[in-house]
Amino acid sequence: MAAETFLFTSESVNEGHPDKLCDQVSDAVLDACLAQDPDSKVACETCTKTNMVMVFGEITTKATVDYEKIVRDTCRDIGFISDDVGLDADHCKVLVNIEQQSPDIAQGVHGHFTKRPEEVGAGDQGIMFGYATDETPELMPLTHMLATKLGARLTEVRKNGTCAWLRPDGKTQVTIEYLNEGGAMVPVRVHTVLISTQHDETVTNDEIAADLKEHVIKPVIPGKYLDENTIFHLNPSGRFVIGGPHGDAGLTGRKIIIDTYGGWGAHGGGAFSGKDPTKVDRSGAYIARQAAKSIIASGLARRCIVQISYAIGVPEPLSVFVDSYGTGKIPDREILKLVKENFDFRPGMISINLDLKKGGKRFIKTAAYGHFGRDDADFTWEVVKPLKFDKASA
């Protein structure tokens, strides 16, 4: 390995992982509430273990929601249809413990629904980050994109019958050798690919390895990144028959790096799933991603991070920060000025500008395979805003 290159790794889990099951249930509840009442205030957590799923939290909504049906439908859609695969959607225990939003929080944030959008305060304090890089068409880190796409492909070949031995739970991890080009990240080659997937009792380790290479890795990872030295760890622990909630307990909000940038950039610690847009953990991270992506797409920098922070009940962010890692065409302070001029970071306005009060089947799509770098009209924060700057002076 040449001296100037380095290795970096990102991981992902697919929709049958117990933590991701919980994220999807929480966002399915949010979708159901917003579909009937766009002003729903939702903070929905989910946990699961063998033969049990529980939803709990604070929800204030005019919507009529059948929580048990949402849980069972979500688990069934993932593929949890029998105890053999880790959970039986139609026969597991479903527990529900939902209360109304605290009146203290309601008064401080939205004045019990009386405040105009521009007056709505942040639902809590916190810090959020957005990140973007020019190393992929999605303006996302390649390690993260490949790990995520491998997980999505595992699910695809399970559901379409290509690899009938697959079961819902699975994890992926990709290590890439990078070149640091003046602060910009240039992928050189894929160093290691790791896949651990749940499977049925009938398949052999050799069959697993052959199918994963042919039907999962080959369609996802561009050949130019693979060479004779690329390392493959395919189900390295051997058997992985017991999975899903039977294998491990699951909780909402446990996969926040997988949801974002795969360890690149930074993370404020707040999870996304099950939260309505007054929760800046979610809406703040979405607008920060849009700002960071727009900086790169507009040619202002090759890589950048944006941080914003909030106080509970206060509409305006306390701080906005931009760092282009030395790749900026103009000074970071000028990029920051453009960001502040072009983006409204007040939570009520983020909701309007990114259309975050729309439910349906929208947010459940974010709850597996990443919230960013997705080509889908519902991912409104991925729409680039052109940022105009004086190229002559740059």
UniProtKB/Swiss-Prot annotation:
Its EC number is 2.5.1.6. The keyword Nucleus does not apply. Binds 2 divalent ions per subunit. The metal ions interact primarily with the substrate. Can utilize magnesium, manganese or cobalt (in vitro). Binds 1 potassium ion per subunit. The potassium ion interacts primarily with the substrate. It holds the Pfam family S-AdoMet_synt_N. One of its GO terms (cellular component) is cytoplasm. Pathway: Amino-acid biosynthesis; S-adenosyl-L-methionine biosynthesis; S-adenosyl-L-methionine from L-methionine: step 1/1. One of its GO terms (biological process) is one-carbon metabolic process. ATP binds at residues 17, 169-171, 237-240, 248, 254-255, 271, 275, 279. It is an enzyme of class 2 (transferase). Keywords: ATP-binding, Cobalt, Cytoplasm, Magnesium, Metal-binding, Nucleotide-binding, One-carbon metabolism, Potassium, Transferase. L-methionine binds at residues 58, 101, 248, 279. Signal peptide: none annotated. It catalyses: L-methionine + ATP + H2O = S-adenosyl-L-methionine + phosphate + diphosphate. The keyword Kinase does not apply. It comes from the Eukaryota. K(+) binds at residue 45. It is found in: Cytoplasm. Its cofactor is Mn(2+); Mg(2+); Co(2+); K(+). HAMAP family: S_AdoMet_synth1 (MF_00086). PANTHER family: S-ADENOSYLMETHIONINE SYNTHETASE. Catalyzes the formation of S-adenosylmethionine from methionine and ATP. The reaction comprises two steps that are both catalyzed by the same enzyme: formation of S-adenosylmethionine (AdoMet) and triphosphate, and subsequent hydrolysis of the triphosphate. NCBIfam families: metK (TIGR01034). Belongs to the AdoMet synthase family. Homotetramer. This is S-adenosylmethionine synthase 2. It comes from Hordeum vulgare.
